[in-house]
From Swiss-Prot:
This is Photosystem I P700 chlorophyll a apoprotein A1. GO terms for biological process: photosynthesis. Keywords: 4Fe-4S, Chlorophyll, Chloroplast, Chromophore, Electron transport, Iron, Iron-sulfur, Magnesium, Membrane, Metal-binding, Oxidoreductase, Photosynthesis, Photosystem I, Plastid, Thylakoid, Transmembrane, Transmembrane helix, Transport. The PsaA/B heterodimer binds the P700 chlorophyll special pair and subsequent electron acceptors. PSI consists of a core antenna complex that captures photons, and an electron transfer chain that converts photonic excitation into a charge separation. The eukaryotic PSI reaction center is composed of at least 11 subunits.
Length: 750
């Protein structure tokens, strides 16, 4: 038994009125920095103002003050999120065809934006069905609202107003907890209390309340909707909540109330807490009763998890003990010291959170189509494509952010003198081995994955299809992926005897699900084409990781620049007289990593878009014959680079290129404009700073001649500013181009 000294009691301590509220301060740009507060001498001032406004580390070195600023900023962020949500719900209430869509979701498209007739813009209001003209939306809000049990635009109005109230509340909380009652540092560092509250409160009670809402409101309302009852005839949510007999008509066990729960006769609740698997054939979404069951189960798990950590009662886990006990035979001191790192460096903490949240977001992208959670989501191809693309991009950005903050931690917060032989130290000591091996893997993957395509292009050009890698010639079947698919397809009755169907139709085995003559989902076959593009995914992901990881591991020092830590997180070069030392800062690795993240995600969303159009999405005739959008051409066309260019990019761009004069013409303009934004980025990425400074000086000379020179001297962008502007426009242009290409295509053919 471990004897430990009694822990200090956890008390919530705040400082009263620590910082006075001052509008004068607010109105003075750069008030947080002595240099910036003086005002501009040159145009560089405005860049530094933007770079440092939210870099709280540069305002003060006091961890408590930094923590309070971050905490307060989080409330501001939540306020903006509530405002945005309120806007979404308001559009649904004021400008949408939600009620019409609800009555006939298979023939009417979702729209929540009607363009005013100014200079002919009303051409954008396409016919979405049911006599409504507007812009077709692909956000999935209609499907989400239906799943929540929202049946009228009035309910959307009320929710929008509620969200505004919460936005105001959050704004107030941000001010209050910085200016009136600011928590002490000890409060921010009390990880056990934080874990208990977040796990039991946010996740546990949050899931429980959602499960309760689903059982008492969503399930009965969706039951009526699925049966074709007019939304106006359906009882209102509060009637279901207050009147148990109403629910008992749909689910008889409701008449017994909580008795089965306390008598452990839980199977009585199996009417509305199911374990079916698969999709509801009426809506093409997961069974809402499965989803309610899932949230109830998750709630129980998190409520238990929220009681595991030791606070004032002397029982439970201590995070520090867990981390320090975490060592194996080959890991030296293991995680000793990690507790101190994560409670004093918010960059280290944020880095872990971003990495996990980014990975989770990408997992969400893959589940939204394979297990579509909301009714009529699976047959809304535009929304399916948008949700996948959106979650992939977001996940990519979050993971790059994880590397960025890990590197900032290394430069600003890592103290090498106190770390010896723990896991982080051991990783840093053999970083050369890690990076050189990773580099070898990248070279191997790059040559081999691309080489397979080049081989196919060459054989195709020489007219030798029998010598190509394809399903009909030299097969490279993804046998491991097919094995995983098969395990999951055969799980019901074998490894998961309680389930009636497998978790997802995509595994195989089952029949397809079609709603209103459109395919919702079917078993997805994998072949040589998928094997090839999968290895391109492996290649681009490994290169992204190589760049980002090198940036983190060499953030403080390298053979080239041993004192890199003294130069900071971002610097252009190691000073004059040190040639070949540009683009070595940790910031530059993030900059370069962003381009490879963009490459990686682009290939993923292209693969998804084409694969789904070729092998999944389409129509089904009365005889049961499925006609896919691109007729199953993925397997034979995507095995050459030429096929990707000709049969995917070029063939599917026809809708966006020919969109002029139609309701999709805005996408044509965006396609053009975003290409322009992307090209504009190259001007910054390939620029020579001196060239612009010379040009500026001759323009300033002309202004002086005419006596119209400004007091603030113009300066060319610094090297890092130029790169920042360049990568921003590169990503913005590239993503918006892809967005216009995808949506014009899928709205036209889907």
């Amino acid at each position: 038994m471990i004897i430990r000294s009694p822990e200090p009691e956890v008390k919530i301590v705040v400082d009263r009125d620590p910082v006075k509220t001052s509008f004068e301060e607010w109105a003075r740009p750069g008030h947080f920095s002595r240099t910036l507060a003086k005002g501009p001498d040159t145009t560089t001032w405005i860049w530094n103002l933007h770079a440092d406004a939210h870099d709280f580390d540069s305002h003060t070195g006091d961890l408590e003050e930094i923590s309070r600023k971050v905490f307060s900023a989080h409330f501001g962020q939540l306020s903006i999120i509530f405002l945005w949500l309120s806007g979404m719900y308001f559009h649904g209430a004021r400008f949408s065809n939600y009620e019409a869509w609800l009555s006939d979701p298979t023939h009417i498209g979702p729209s929540a934006q009607v363009v005013w007739p100014i200079v002919g813009q009303e051409i954008l209001n396409g016919d979405v069905g049911g006599g409504f003209r507007g812009i077709q939306i692909t956000s999935g809000f209609f499907q989400l609202w239906r799943a929540s049990g929202i049946t009228s635009e009035l309910q959307l109005y009320c929710t929008a107003i509620g969200a505004l109230v919460f936005a105001a509340l959050m704004l107030f909380a941000g001010w209050f907890h910085y200016h009136k009652a600011a928590p002490k540092l000890a409060w921010f560092q009390d990880v056990e209390s934080m874990l208990n509250h977040h796990l039991a409160g946010l996740l546990g009670l949050g899931s429980l309340s959602w499960a309760g809402h689903q059982i008492h409101v969503s399930l009965p309302i969706n039951q009526f909707l699925d049966a074709g009852v007019d939304p106006k005839e359906i009882p209102l949510p509060h009637e279901f909540i207050l009147n148990r007999d109403l629910l008992a008509q749909l689910y008889p066990s409701f008449a017994e109330g909580a008795t089965p729960f306390f008598t452990l006769n839980w199977s009585k609740y199996a009417e509305f807490l199911t374990f079916r698997g698969g999709l509801d054939p009426v809506t093409g979404g997961l069974w809402l009763t499965d989803i309610a069951h899932h949230h109830l189960a998750i709630a129980i798990l998190f409520l238990i998890a929220g009681h595991m950590y030791r606070t004032n009662w002397g029982i439970g886990h201590g995070l520090k003990d867990i981390l320090e006990a975490h060592k194996g035979p080959f890991t030296g001191q293991g995680h000793k010291g990690l507790y101190e790192i994560l409670t004093t460096s918010w960059h280290a903490q944020l880095s872990l959170n971003l990495a996990m949240l980014g990975s989770t977001t990408i997992v969400v992208a893959h589940h939204m189509y394979s297990m579509p959670p909301y009714p009529y989501l699976a047959t809304d191809y535009g929304t399916q494509l948008s949700l996948f693309t959106h979650h992939m991009w977001i996940g990519g950005f979050l993971i790059v952010g994880a590397a960025a903050h890990a590197a900032i931690f290394m430069v600003r917060d890592y103290d090498p003198t106190t770390r010896y032989n723990d896991l982080l130290d051991r990783v840093l000591r053999h970083r050369d081995a890690i990076i050189s091996h990773l580099n070898w893997v990248c070279i191997f993957l790059g040559f081999h994955s691309f080489g397979l395509y080049i081989h196919n292009d060459t054989m195709s050009a020489l007219g030798r299809p029998q010598d190509m890698f394809s399903d009909t010639a030299i097969q490279l079947q993804p046998i491991f992926a097919q094995w995983v698919q098969n395990i999951h397809a055969t799980a019901p009755g074998v490894t998961a005897p309680g389930a009636t169907t497998s978790t997802s139709l995509t595994w195989g085995g089952g029949e397809l699900v079609a709603v209103g003559g459109k395919v919702a989902l079917l078993p997805i076959p994998l072949g040589t084409a998928d094997f090839l593009v999968h290895h391109i995914h492996a290649f681009t992901i490994h290169v992204t990781v190589l760049i980002l990881l090198k940036g983190v591991l060499f953030a403080r020092s390298s053979r080239l620049i041993p004192d890199k830590a003294n130069l900071g997180f971002r610097f252009p070069c190691d000073g004059p007289g040190r040639g070949g030392t540009c683009q070595v800062s940790a910031w530059d690795h993030v900059f370069l990593g962003l381009f490879w993240m963009y490459n990686a995600i682009s290939v993923v969303i292209f693969h998804f878009s084409w694969k789904m159009q070729s092998d999944v999405w389409g129509t089904i005739s009365d005889q049961g014959v499925v006609t896919h959008i691109t007729g199953g051409n993925f397997a034979q066309s995507s095995i050459t680079i030429n096929g990707w260019l000709r049969d995917f990019l070029w063939a599917q761009a026809s809708q966006v290129i020919q969109s002029y004069g139609s309701s999709l013409s805005a996408y044509g303009l965006f396609f053009l404009g975003a290409h322009f934004v992307w090209a504009f980025s190259l001007m910054f990425l390939f620029s020579g700073r001196g060239y612009w400074q010379e040009l500026i000086e001759s323009i300033v000379w002309a202004h002086n001649k005419l006596k119209v020179a400004p007091a603030t001297q113009p300066r060319a962008l610094s090297i890092i500013q130029g790169r920042a502007v360049g990568v921003t426009h590169y990503l913005l242009g590239g993503i918006a181009t892809t967005w216009a290409f995808f949506l014009a295509r899928i709205i036209a053919v889907g």
